[in-house]
Amino acid sequence: MLEILADESVGGNSPTVIINRGAKKMQWPFIGCGGLGFSKTAHFTCFDSMTQLCEEDIPCIHLPPQHRSVYKMSTENKMRAVVFHSPYKVAVEERPIPKIQDSGDIVVKVTYTALCGSDLHTFRGIEPAGTGFVMGHEVTGEVVEVGSGVKSIQKGDMVVSAFTTSCGECFYCKQGFSSRCEKSVLFGCDHLDGAQAEYVRIPNADGTVMKAPEGVEEKYLVLMADIFPTGYFAASNAFKGYTPEQISEQTVVLIGCGPVGLCALINALEFKPKHLLAVDSIPSRLELARSLGAEPWNFQQDREGLDKRVKELTNGRGADAVIEVVGLSPALRTGFDLLRPWGTISSVGVHNGEIPWAGNDAYDKNLRIQMGRCPVRSVSPQALDVLKKNQHKLGFMADKIMPLSQAVEGYELFNAMKVQKVIFKAGE
C-alpha cells in the first residue's frame, strides 16, 4: 500500500506528488488527466504490472516512465490473487507474493492462468472446502525464485505446471501414476494456494513443472496444465489394449463437450476410430464438436435417436468405448447403457455421487472401466505431441482472455456456460 500526499496549491496537469514510503519521501511531478488540485491523503492498492494509479475521486494519475522502477520497487511484495470466500463468491484481493518454503520449491511469475470446470465444483459449493485460499490450478509463467534443492529448473525458465504436485521419486510417480504421488497436493485448495494470481509457489518443482517447448503459443500451453493432458488420458484409456486395426473399426461415444470433452475429442481422433459421436445438450458446444470432426448428438432433444444411431453403426451391439467427462451419475449411466458387452468406459469426470449401476449389471456386461484423475506430469510428453499438431484447432479455447483483475466477471461467465473457456492474463 502506498500513501500519496498532494499539496492543495498544486493543480493543473502536472501536480507534484510526494510518495510516503516508510521514513523516505520521494517527490516528482505526475502527468494527470486534468485539473487535479486536491488536499488529502489518498491510499491506493498498487501492483507491479500497473503503470497508473486510480481512485474513485481521482480520475487518473499516470506514473512517469522514468520513475516506474521506483514504483515497482515499492510494491514488489504484493500481488493480486483470486480468493475463495464462500459458494458463488470470489474476490480479487491483494496478497503477499509467495516465498520459497522448501528447498524443492520454485516461485513463478504468472503469465496465463485459466478457469477450469473443476474450479466450479469449489465455486458452486459442490466440493467442500475451506475459505481464504487462492483459486486455480492452470498456469504458465516465468521462474523468478528457485529453491536450493531444485535441479532441473533455473531462474528465467518459462514453465507450465501440472495441476497437482508430484515428487517424481515415489512408487506411483515411477509407475507413471503421478496423480497419486505420495506427496501430491492439488493447487487451489485449503492446503496449497492456487495459480489465479500474479505469482504462485510450486512445491516439488522438479517433478511437477515442464519447461515450455518451442513452437507452442503460451495461451495454448496453459491447457497443458490440466485439460489437454486430461483429454489425452481419457482418449488413450478408451483405446488401451486395442491395435490400430481394431480401433479403425470402432464406434466411440464421447459424453460431454465442454473444454475437457473437446480436448478428449481432439485426442480421440488421433487414434482414428471409425465413428466418433459427441453428446451434449448445448448447441454451441455441439457445433464445435462437429467442426472438429465428430458426429454431434443433442441427447435432450433426441435420446431415442442417439440409441438407434449407435445400434445402427454397430450392428446392434452398442458402442465399443465411451468417454465420459461430465462427472454426473446420469451421464455415466447413459454411457453404460450405450456400451456393448466387453466395452470400455473411460471416465475423467469428477464424480461425487454413487456409481449408477449394480454390480451384477457390470458383471453381465463384462464391463471394463477406468476412472480417476489424470496423471498430468506422467502423460505430458505424449499429450504435448498431440497439442503441437493440433494447436491451430484450439482458437475457441483462447477467445476469452481476460485481465486477472476481472476474474469475478470471468467466474460468472464461465459458471453460466456463456463461454467455452476463460483464460486470465496476470498483470492486467
From Swiss-Prot:
Quaternary assembly: Homodimer.
Organism expressing this protein natively: Aspergillus flavus (strain ATCC 200026 / FGSC A1120 / IAM 13836 / NRRL 3357 / JCM 12722 / SRRC 167)
Cofactor binding, note field: Binds 2 Zn(2+) ions per subunit.
EC code: 1.1.1.1
Annotated Gene3D superfamilies: Medium-chain alcohol dehydrogenases, catalytic domain, NAD(P)-binding Rossmann-like Domain
Catalytic activity, as annotated: a primary alcohol + NAD(+) = an aldehyde + NADH + H(+); a secondary alcohol + NAD(+) = a ketone + NADH + H(+)
Post-translational modification: Benzoylation at lys-393 by gcnE leads to the activation od adhB.
Protein name: Zinc-type alcohol dehydrogenase B
